[in-house]
Amino acid sequence: MIELQGLSQRFPGGSGEVHALRDVSLSIASGEIFGIIGRSGAGKSTLVRAINLLNRPTSGRVIVAGQDLTALDKGALREARREIGMIFQHFNLLSSRTVYDNVALPLELAGKSKQEIASTVEPLLELVGLSKLRDRYPAQISGGQKQRVGIARALASKPKVLLSDEATSALDPETTRAILDLLKQINRELGLTIVMITHQMEVIKQVCDRVAVLEAGQVVESGRVIDVFLRPQHEVTRAMIGDVIAQELPVSVLKRVESRLGNGRDHVYRLAFTGENVDQPVLAQAIRQHGLDFNILHGHIDEIQGQAFGSLAIMATGELADVRAAMDYLQSQGVVVEEIEHVV
């Protein structure tokens, strides 16, 4: 559905050119929810605006539904953009227009008749749960409801792609969950491809199928969300995952284990479980089979896209050969095992 090929974006700066994007290549499948995450200044918003050419990249190609947008003239690009809806952190609603009229605006600009507008807007208001608020003005509704108006407006032209640029960043946690549930519903019912730009790993965890991690304008890691959580490779990814699932041991735990490490018998590991392994007694089986003592230092159980995910930090005590055999057994059962050598 979306192919980004070698995108680079340079802007003039006070001390020379600023490289906002550096050779970014991504493939986003039709009908998936794809997340792009990164810290402030990583290039996320520049990238999402390159997808619909609000920012024309300095080099590279943007292909949407088989069409190279970078090769289109102004008229053809304007038509192609109707296939791409967009929602923002700030709702950009017209205060003088009602909820209904804000959603109808792009259809009015496209020259649609009142009957055509009504046949599109009314089902959209039903979809986003705003039918009863159709005659209210933006000042009379909540932030979450304003974002629902923004979503309905973005869908009015019946796009194939929806771009979300930090659309939940200004919302409280409960409203954020409701908006994310709505986006999942839209993705499921309309088959819409959604690209989520966010700095919140919690958003990625809740709704995205795959994710790309952006740092200094480059993609440093990408893959299925569950795989990235299980095996984060880049330090930026590990730090951002740590915001929602603790990866580092608490200081109080470090103090307890500090005196025992280095004796050759005590080893600290991080174990990650997913799917069926969360419910299976694989750790107990490893203890029984290899005669080890295990001490659970820290743990967390969560859910990623409806799939159970667990993380444990343990201290294994025993002969080194037995400890390694136990870890090999856990890996054979699908558990991700990482020895924490820098614990102190």
Swiss-Prot record:
Membrane topology designation: Peripheral membrane protein
Keywords, comma-separated and alphabetical: Amino-acid transport, ATP-binding, Cell inner membrane, Cell membrane, Membrane, Nucleotide-binding, Translocase, Transport
Keyword Membrane listed: yes
GO molecular function annotation: ABC-type D-methionine transporter activity; ATP binding; ATP hydrolysis activity
InterPro entries given in the database record: AAA+_ATPase, ABC_transporter-like_ATP-bd, ABC_transporter-like_CS, ACT-like_dom_sf, MetN_ABC, MetN_ABC_transporter-like, NIL_domain, P-loop_NTPase
Subcellular location: Cell inner membrane
Keyword Manganese: no
EC number: 7.4.2.11
Reaction(s) catalysed by this chain's protein: L-methionine(out) + ATP + H2O = L-methionine(in) + ADP + phosphate + H(+); D-methionine(out) + ATP + H2O = D-methionine(in) + ADP + phosphate + H(+)
Record-annotated ABC transporter domain positions: 2-241
Binding site for ATP: 38-45
One of the record's GO cellular component terms: plasma membrane
PANTHER family: AMINO ACID IMPORT ATP-BINDING PROTEIN (PTHR43166), METHIONINE IMPORT ATP-BINDING PROTEIN METN (PTHR43166:SF30)
Family: Belongs to the ABC transporter superfamily. Methionine importer (TC 3.A.1.24) family.
SUBUNIT field: The complex is composed of two ATP-binding proteins (MetN), two transmembrane proteins (MetI) and a solute-binding protein (MetQ).
Protein name, per record: Methionine import ATP-binding protein MetN
Species of the source: Cupriavidus metallidurans (strain ATCC 43123 / DSM 2839 / NBRC 102507 / CH34) (Ralstonia metallidurans)
Gene: metN
